[in-house]
Structure formats: C-alpha cells, structure tokens
Amino acid sequence: MTRPHMAPPDIPQAHPKALGYLRDDVSGQGWQQDEQAILALATRLGYDLVKTVRMNPDIHDPLHRLLIIVRRLDIAAVITPTLEHIGGPGRICRVCSLITVTPEYNWALAYKPSEEGGR
C-alpha cells in the first residue's frame, strides 16, 4: 500500500497579490511619494505588490481598465493613497479588497455599495 505524499508543514505560503493604483491628476508632483507609501503599506500588511498602475486624466473609464488588470492578474487587493483616487469602494470591492493609505482602511471584497459613505 502506498502512502499519499504529504508536504512538510513549514513550506512558506505565497503572499496575496496587491496592485497599487493612483491617478496622476490627484497625486500631482507627489506621485513618487504616493508610490512609496503604497509599497510600504503593502509590505507591512503582507501583500506582494505586483505593480503600481498610474492613470492620467485623459483615460476614459480608468476604473474599468483597472478592473481588467485586477482580474487578469488575480489580485487580492488594490492599494491607493486616498479614496479620491478611486472615487468610492463599490466597483473595486465587487472584485477584490480596497485599501487606502490615508486614512488607512480596508474595504473587504463583497463590500455593499449601500455602505459607500462610511466604514
């Protein structure tokens, strides 16, 4: 009789993937500081920051484009400097969690759009 192979319990688990997101018109000249803040928060929370996406104001429906990337890369959370970059958590939280740097807050996956205004 053969035994099934069992992996040793100390194999490290992969970190959940995060995607940084910022809008150039909101970050302005401070976009590099915003990128660093996103990276620092992702690292502290145990996420693997896959990349940071910067959108300029000329892009039509930037959240739609962001959600395409989120789905393709199987992202667990989008991290953004402030809620102003996203406009509200509703669309993002149908697909993944949304985390803001300032104030630091996490809107979980499956967030209810009726809760748009608060925590």
What are these regions (language model features)?
Residues 1-119:
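Short, structured surface patches at the beginning of a domain
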